[in-house]
Amino acid sequence: MLSAPTPMHTVSSQASPTQQARCLLVLLPGFSDSDTDFDQHGFIADIHARKLSVDTISANATIGYYAKRTILGRIETDVLAPMRAKRYEQTWFMGISMGGLGTILVAQQHEKELTGLILMAPYLGDDDVIDEIAKAGGVAKWKPPAVVDPEDYQREVWRWLKHATANPTTSPAIYLASGDQDPLARGHRLLATAVQDGHLFRTRGNHDWGPWRTLWANFLDTSDFRTRCAP
């Protein structure tokens, strides 16, 4: 049976022991990963090494929460609600693979609260949805269904991505990072045509932690996240 404990387990890390950081970064793991993997694979250390003003929360948003459709409720109750009282200047979400999908789902409900989304090798839907958008000529030309259907979550994810990329000044910034041999690359290539200049990060590699660590370092070193979350 898929597990979805209440409350959702989280692991926090602070930039400073004496003062709150400017930015909050929430990290959502992939299908077979957990909240501790970000620390084990050096993602948190990479932030500290660059002396960024970033506090992090790694959420154990495993597949059970998605299957039971409690992911958004738990993120709201166990992550966002406690953090609102702290009044961070900026709130960012980063998700890997399935966590990338989760990040978009959160953004659909909390668009005005979020500063940016970092989608690393995100799952963006099954082949039929990707084929449909590709045949339409890409995200900009694709026409979503006339009626919003929460049950058709994959097309609703792309409806939001189409809206957000077409309205970058009023939507959270979207950053896309992926390996060139990733099995989910078809969806990544579609989204890549719509993201802003400077928001696309590519490297050699497949769907695993090696290229993800490289992409993460590149993002931290070259994106405007570094200046936005400077001390």
Task: Give residue spans per PLM region.
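Non-catalytic cap/lid and distal C-terminal segments of serine-dependent acyl enzymes
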Residues: M1-P231
